[in-house]
Amino acid sequence: MSDNKVLQSTAIIRFPDCDPFNHLNNSRYIDYFINAREDHLMEAYQFSPYAYAKEKGLSWVIGQNQIAYLRPAMLMEKVVITSTILKLKERDILVEMMMWDKDKTQLKSLLWSVFVHYNFKTGKSEFHSEDLVTYFKPFENPLEKDVSFEERLLQLKNSL
């Protein structure tokens, strides 16, 4: 995957998000990933999903998540979160997100999220406009080979 299409930010694991063992609670990983992705959209793409929703009555909703937990993220640990668009399709976008330790030597979690383009007025999915496709297509970062989530996870484990 091309590095210039992989966006990243940092986060600190906070106390209210942890379980009694001081590990990030499994349900909170997705919150950290989605918050980072929103930041990535606004900072790197200069695209606010909130302004888009307000102006167009359209946005994206999560249609599917696949997540693997590899190592615990610990209380007050600084982590690096990356995101990249794997596939831009007619009605949805597949985004890969990873959570790493601060040095990016230990992968803590892998998430694939399918974001479905959604029309608030009709309550149904909506095709991406030509303008959106033109805007986001340059950021698409497909894997060299079309693989399943499990195969991707195995690739990453074997490369570390």
What positions do the PLM features span?
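Functionalized membrane-embedded alpha-helices
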Residues: 79-83
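Terminal targeting signals and extreme-terminal segments of soluble enzymes
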Residues: 1-78, 90-94, 98-160
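Short, charged beta-turn/beta-strand-edge "cap" motif at the junction between a beta-strand
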Residues: 85-88
